[in-house]
């Protein structure tokens, strides 16, 4: 996301579900000119080419997320992120004001960093070399979540699945 002190504007979003499904999209509506130096250096170069089908309007991203999250399904939606307050705002703004957010979408994102501290700050895997790509970060957060909640590192299970490329903030 772009954060210039006045706006939080979604650039891309990556989501990984516990069942292994993935969602990834890049907004066609953010203004790269408003990105600060850090985002220009660490985020924008990792985006797919603009001709990619992964570039979508905010409406298309919103609708894709509603389907991916199964907001009409029986399971409640639970969101987790590492220091995810601004990420949550960028997500919610896809629906406009908070009052327009579907009731199935949580009004908060659970905090992986706090879970890590509550578990005694256990050793975590290093950040991937290509971090700051929304999908790479989401995969890494899922890896950390599973490691903290089960004690198992899923990295060896992901190798085969990840070699096939990206599928889905």
Task: Give the role of each language-model region.
Residues 79-84, 123-169:
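Acidic, Mg2+-coordinating catalytic module of metal-dependent nucleases/exonucleases
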Residues 85-106:
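Substrate-recognition/cap helix-loop segment adjacent to the acidic, metal-dependent catalytic center
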Residues 98-102, 122, 152:
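Substrate-binding/catalytic groove segments of enzymes
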Residues 1-4, 9-10, 16, 86, ...:
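Metal-dependent nucleotidyl/phosphoryl-transfer cores and adjacent nucleic-acid-binding surfaces
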Residues 103-124:
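Short, flexible loop segments at boundaries between secondary-structure elements
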Residues 60, 83-86, 107-110, 133-136:
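Short beta->alpha linker loops
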Residues 59-63, 67, 110-113, 140-143:
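Short, contiguous clusters of charged residues that form electrostatic/catalytic patches at enzyme active sites
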Residues 1-82, 128:
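Conserved non-catalytic scaffold segment of RNase H-like nuclease domains
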């Amino acid at each position: 996301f772009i954060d210039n002190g006045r706006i939080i504007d979604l650039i891309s979003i990556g989501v990984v579900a516990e069942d292994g499904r993935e969602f990834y999209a890049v907004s066609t509506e953010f203004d790269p000119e408003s990105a600060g130096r850090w985002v220009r250096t660490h985020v924008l170069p990792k985006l797919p080419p603009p001709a990619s089908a992964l570039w979508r309007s905010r409406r298309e991203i919103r609708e894709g997320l509603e389907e991916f999250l199964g907001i009409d399904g029986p399971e409640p939606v639970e969101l987790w992120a590492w220091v995810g307050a601004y990420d949550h705002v960028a997500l919610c703004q896809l629906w406009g004001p908070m009052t327009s957010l579907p009731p199935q979408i949580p009004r908060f994102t659970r905090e992986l960093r706090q879970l890590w501290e509550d578990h005694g700050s256990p050793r975590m895997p290093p950040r991937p070399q290509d971090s700051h790509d929304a999908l790479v970060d989401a995969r890494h957060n899922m890896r950390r979540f599973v490691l903290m909640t089960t004690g198992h590192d899923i990295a060896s299970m992901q190798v085969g699945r990840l070699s096939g490329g990206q599928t889905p903030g």
